[in-house]
A protein has these predicted regions:
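Mature extracytoplasmic enzyme cores
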Residues: 1-146
Length: 146
């Protein structure tokens, strides 16, 4: 399983998994590979005009082999609805997860970056992460993360 590190030097890190899940929360000077914080996940709620609302955890389905020696456990809320699939692409310092689900009336992708030092944020590699707050167009909503 992939765990793309998000975080700068001395800032700790959170891993972005291939399904779009947040994992390996290594913050507050605590190494924690393989661990996920309880109920720490983005979600999506969307409603097309004239259609029922749809809500999902914003990550692809959990597929075997399941994580952990005791299966899914309760930390990652396995009973909540997730998306059908995801495609992960990444080349340090940037990663992108494109989500796929026929039930969603929108296309969803998560883009994340990991600066090694603060001045990297002004480099061309980070131009696509330039929103200080949410950025939106008719086809795209961008939320800065992290």
């Amino acid at each position: 399983m992939i765990s793309f590190p998000l975080g700068g030097i001395g800032a700790g890190s959170i891993g972005l998994g291939g399904r779009g899940q947040l994992r390996d929360w290594e913050i507050f000077n605590k190494p924690d590979k393989g661990n996920s914080l309880q109920y720490s996940f983005p979600s999506i709620w969307v409603q097309a005009e004239g259609a029922p609302a749809v809500a999902h955890v914003l990550e692809a389905r959990i597929e075997p082999p399941y994580e952990g020696q005791n299966g899914l456990g309760s930390r990652n809320a396995p009973g909540l609805s997730r998306l059908e699939g995801a495609t992960f692409t990444g080349e340090f310092p940037a990663a992108k997860v494109e989500f796929h689900d026929a039930r969603l009336p929108v296309q969803v992708a998560l883009e994340a970056g990991s600066p090694s030092f603060p001045s990297m944020l002004t480099s061309p590699a980070y131009q696509w992460l330039s929103c200080a707050t949410a950025c939106a167009t008719p086809d795209e909503l961008r939320l800065p993360f992290p």
